[in-house]
Amino acid sequence: MTKEEIINAVGPCSIMCYTCFGYINGGIRKHAACLYELYKGWYEGHVNVYKHDLTKEHIEKLNRINIFNEMLQGLYSGDGCEGCQKNNGERGGCIESCGIPKCSKEHGVNFCADCAEFPCKKDCVPERIKQQWHDGNNFIKEHGIEKWFEKNKTIAHYIDQYNAANE
């Protein structure tokens, strides 16, 4: 990925848009589309060609594959989010009340880490992502966005918040 693509795949708060199912250029959407194409017609082909030779177990597996493929299609089709870097500041981010996209635009930075005021005391950072915001932007400031992306591109979106809430 180019640096610009990496910047667009990470929110100014440091949360990985890339690993969110809603992100239009994200890994989940890309992989779901690829799997969907591989499975497209597979169910119908097996049911129609082998319908007289299928056991009850085979039919159950085929039905689950069909449901799985419908879910895949739902993951990659339809409207998606362009990520907070493309957000002009008129709305929040993943969390509607988030003021980080607007603040980063006002300060002319891609990431809070790039701002002279970071870490600031503004109340635009939602409580549930404060630790992620702080730690992620410190990492970006010290090591750069490319290393942050490489380190986190396969980690589930909001997993840190989920793990903290379930400890």
For the regions a protein language model found, what residue spans apply to each?
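Cysteine-centered metal-binding/redox modules
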Residues: 1-167
